Amino acid sequence: MTTTFLRCAATLVAGAALSLPVLAQKPADATAKEASVKVDANLPAYAPTAGVSGSIKSVGSDTMNNTMTLWAEGFAKHYPNVKVEIEGKGSATAPAALIGGTSSFGPMSRPMKESEIDEFEKKFGYKPTGIAAGIDMLAVYVHKDNPIQSLTLQQVDAIFSKTRKGGADKEIVTWGDLGLTGEWANRPISLYGRNSASGTYGYFKEHALFKGDFKDSVKEQPGSSAVVQGVAGDVAGIGYSGIGYKTADVRAVPLAKDGKSKVIDATPENAYTGEYPLARQLLIYVNHKPGSAIDPLRREFLRYMMSKEGQLDVLKDGYYPLPSRMAKKQLEKVGL
């Protein structure tokens, strides 16, 4: 779990940013992504307003810890009397916190399940509002020295799943099973992943494992960065994590939906078009009664998120910013 407290006074914000371990682990090549992807020039610059104070608490996805922290730091520059607390326990914790009234925002790296929505609606009489905050690609990573050229989702399923709902005839346990030769032929595949509280785990289970079950041999890691670190230190390793966590020590393997489909690289263009099989929206859920006015504190935080500055924070964290038309639609969901 990661918990971050930011009181929006300059000295304390600076201290919080310097001491935040997740930010320190973020790969340096996010800067390279900034050079190839630009924030939409049509996004509005954030304009602060008077009368904003109080406390914000975010509970949910650890994948979005860095982004939430960057937003909090940017927000801090405008509102010195606002306190922000960020807890990254996994996407599964977001719905319960919103239902229990213990959080302002519920960041999730997957959509809420029907059961979670139903539980929320049972208490409040309306559904939670999901707001897209950025675009991510869930990459399948191998060690940088691994010669594998591409994988189909059926192969990914046969590597990670014991149920093989993707239709593979047999499980894949060595790199030779994927056609690699020489020293790789008999090398066992070493699996890295997340635990069941993670939205990344849930998304991968649904979309790459065809809702099947993970093998018991998957080494469950405490965070997205840890998965990449595990693969980076294991020449036979393979794991899944957000594209924002890519480092120079791993490769994101190009993927195809099936054996008849085009192999798609993990590039920004393929994320925006939706061609990449594991592209996903990063979501922020809020408790907002339709037709009502959202409170000033959450209103302004959401406006900051969807501003030019807020989407630059998304880009800095290694994800892809929203086009202005999409950002505008997100604010309309809460009457803004």
Model feature map: region roles:
Residues M1-A10:
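Bacterial N-terminal signal peptides that target proteins for export
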Residues A9-S19:
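Bacterial N-terminal signal peptides
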Residues L20-A24:
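Sec/Tat signal peptide C-region and signal peptidase I cleavage site
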